Amino acid sequence: MEKPIVAIVGRPNVGKSTLFNKLIGERRAIIADEAGTTRDRQYGETIWNGRVFTIVDTAGLLVGDDDPNLPLAEIVRRTHQQAQLAIDEADVIVFMVDVREGLIAADEEVAALLRRSSKPVVLGVNKADTEDRRQNAVEFYNLGLGDPIALSAYHGTGSGDLLDEIVRHLPAGQEEEEDDNSLKIAIVGRPNVGKSSLLNKLVGEERVVVSNIPGTTRDSIDTKLTYKGIPITLIDTAGIRRRGSIEQGIERYSVLRTMKAIERCHIALILVDAQEGPTAQDTHVAGMVLEANKGLAIIVNKWDLIDKAKFSYEDAKTTMSQVFHFAPYAPIEFISAKTGQRATKVLDIAQTIQSERNKRVSTSDINNLLRAAVREHPPTAMHKGAHLRLFYATQAQVEPPVFLFFSNAPEQVHFGYKRYLENRIREQYGFIGTPIILVFKGREEEQTVSVSGKR
């Protein structure tokens, strides 16, 4: 079931990211952070009074938005852009203001935009960390957005009141969708890369164009089909555009809609335009897929329009591998949705990835691999004068694959050594198109069997 989305908007330096971090706490998913995949995490789940929802820091979605040195006019424009994105995509909007600066014109302009929308708005007056400042929060009644909630995102005071108000405005909970056991594939990518064309080619029929109704939201479009005996649900974000989806003539990602599609899917297919090449937005969304621990494939569309004499398949494959270097295990396929060239190959790839995500490695096999890896490249860290030791490993779960490693000092295992072990696992067992998660835990030495052969 899709979780409601709560978007935080506001000018630079009002405390959006501080509030975001306070509300989501420490993210539990354990994956490797690598430069170039995502910026600071912009979204995370939280639960309050039994309701689970996704919090989004819209400043993180729009590059450069939290630069306090921007000219005032640019700050206003970008804050408007944040607000419009939230109006387009979120279920509840948290509008953050700064009590220390008081009510300023930039806040009033954004408030006017929010009042014209049909979305519920919760007004958070931040940096109210003294009694006088809490009293000054009443000034923000003038924004016409209801009761201002005085809080200090840094200290956490008032955050409970804010969460109460957020939950009060969340849409009514929906019944859990019946599990149809189909393979759920999300087709994501920038506008005009051919998402609709690919979907139409796969299902063999023209899709109805979704009407653009200002002020409303729609769930992603689901299309069901069967391919090689496997039931498949295609989750399509194509055609879903809002009045706010065009900014100075350049269409931007429907980022929050893409997040919902990624949340629901097993496998995400990121479509890249062969003529334009991959963009920072494409790598950003790929990072979102990896953050969610979903399967990933890179699909390069419009390959029929490329002059192969000037830009060969090998050249294109090298370029894509370099851009998506943080996911070297993700398959890359070149297609033409328009002509149908290799279009159904994407379904074969998705089925392969799903099989890889459900692959299990026996405990004896993973420990044989660990012994060999430690023998060839021992960990060099020290713990209380003793060498770091890895005793034992086992696969804990599938979809995504999770491996547990037991050590005398799990916190001392270096990121580089974790990557080494991941590479050894992939060399031996593949795990094409899926993140694998390595978790290191402590265990008393006498309770384990040492794979290093030493006691």
Curated annotation (Swiss-Prot):
Gene Ontology MF term list: GTP binding; ribosome binding
InterPro entries, alphabetized: G_ENGA, GTP-bd, GTPase_Der, KH_dom-like, KH_dom-like_a/b, P-loop_NTPase, Small_GTP-bd
Domain EngA-type G: 4-174, 183-358
Limits of the KH-like domain: 359-444
Binding-site residues for GTP 2, renumbered to this chain: 189-196, 236-240, 301-304
Family matches, as SUPFAM superfamilies: P-loop containing nucleoside triphosphate hydrolases
Binding site for GTP 1: 10-17, 57-61, 126-129
GO terms of biological process kind: ribosome biogenesis
Protein origin, superkingdom: Bacteria
Keywords: GTP-binding, Nucleotide-binding, Repeat, Ribosome biogenesis
Repeat recorded as keyword: yes
NCBIfam families named in the record: GTPase_EngA, small_GTP
Similarity comment: Belongs to the TRAFAC class TrmE-Era-EngA-EngB-Septin-like GTPase superfamily. EngA (Der) GTPase family.
Function: GTPase that plays an essential role in the late steps of ribosome biogenesis.
Family matches, as HAMAP family: GTPase_Der
Quaternary structure annotation from Swiss-Prot or TrEMBL: Associates with the 50S ribosomal subunit.
Name of protein: GTPase Der
Phylogenetic lineage: Bacteria, Bacillati, Chloroflexota, Chloroflexia, Herpetosiphonales
Gene name linked to the record: der
